[in-house]
Amino acid sequence: MSLYQHMLVFYAVMAAIAFLITWFLSHDKKRIRFLSAFLVGATWPMSFPVALLFSLF
């Protein structure tokens, strides 16, 4: 596999992990939980640390 494919697999795995963690941290309706988990998973390098910080308070 090329470097690009390794990076793509890493991004997809981290997106899935961020999706699952965000899903279990949120306490809203299922639609809102799915939407927030999907958006955080898709943009995890910027939004996942923010979601973790918000879950602390």
Curated annotation (Swiss-Prot):
Induction: By conditions that induce the stringent response such as increased expression of RelA, heat shock at 43 degrees Celsius, probably under control of sigma factor E and/or H (rpoE, rpoH), or growth in the presence of trimethoprim (TMP), mupirocin or serine hydroxamate. The chain crosses the membrane at residues 6-26, 34-54. The keyword Hydrolase does not apply. It is found in: Cell inner membrane. Belongs to the GhoT/OrtT toxin family. Acts as an orphan toxin which is important for maintaining cell fitness during stress related to the stringent response (decreased amino acid, purine and thymidine availability). Overexpression inhibits cell growth and increases the formation of persister cells. Causes 99.9% of cells to undergo bacterial lysis within 2 hours after induction; nucleoids condense, the cytoplasm seems empty and the periplasmic space enlarges. The intracellular ATP level decreases about 27-fold suggesting the membrane potential may be disrupted. This is Orphan toxin OrtT. It comes from Escherichia coli (strain K12). The gene is ortT.
